[in-house]
Amino acid sequence: MSDIEARVRKIVAEKLNVDEEKVTNTSTFVDELGADSLDTVELVMALEDEFQCEIGDEAAEKMTSVQHAIDYIKSNAKC
């Protein structure tokens, strides 16, 4: 697991109040981890803080799983 993956999974576990072992790259925020719309906004904000980047609204809406978050951060040089 890469450093980015580990950091994303840790943030997801903390923000969604789930055990880190239950957070996999394929976990979806809403369906599998029980996030609501406020949780997802807070999660995106935490990712922005951790990786010192800005995640636009359109990208945030498409970010529905742990892997989507990891891919976005890896593919954006700002992160």
From Swiss-Prot:
Top-level taxon of origin: Bacteria
Post-translational modification: 4'-phosphopantetheine is transferred from CoA to a specific serine of apo-ACP by AcpS. This modification is essential for activity because fatty acids are bound in thioester linkage to the sulfhydryl of the prosthetic group.
Positions where O-(pantetheine 4'-phosphoryl)serine occurs in the chain: S37
Ranges in coiled-coil conformation: none
Subcellular location: Cytoplasm
Domain Carrier: 2-77
Protein name: Acyl carrier protein
Taxonomy of the source species: Bacteria, Pseudomonadati, Pseudomonadota, Gammaproteobacteria, Lysobacterales
